[in-house]
């Protein structure tokens, strides 16, 4: 099966993690004016093998509690979040290209069996 190799499992799981990060960044930006709102981010911990034998990128959402930029307690910095969004975009594009390359390699695998 196409997604049975370790590299593809890690890349697709990485895309899931980057998708979660993108949602968190957009959530932060949408709460730019919310009093007391604290920035959330996604932390990538490591690659692990789950109980089903599939490799995944472990990630979790964390709240940045110890910084405050404004008197109302909000700590969202639009410039920082915009930069994170761009960085996330570049990482997603890289993984899309790698996955696309892996998939295109399967076109060149000779088909077994009688003609």
Predicted regions and their residues:
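Amphipathic alpha-helical polymerization modules
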Residues: 1-115
């Amino acid at each position: 099966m196409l997604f049975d190799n370790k590299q593809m499992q890690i890349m697709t799981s990485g895309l899931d993690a980057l998708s979660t990060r993108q949602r968190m960044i957009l959530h932060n930006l949408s709460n730019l004016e919310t009093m007391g709102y604290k920035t959330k981010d996604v932390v990538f911990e490591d690659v692990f093998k789950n109980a089903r034998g599939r490799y995944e990128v472990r990630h979790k959402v964390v709240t940045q509690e110890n910084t405050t930029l404004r008197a109302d307690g909000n700590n969202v910095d639009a410039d920082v979040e915009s930069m994170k969004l761009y960085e996330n975009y570049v990482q997603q594009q890289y993984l899309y290209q790698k996955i696309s390359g892996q998939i295109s390699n399967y076109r060149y695998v000779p088909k077994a069996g009688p003609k």
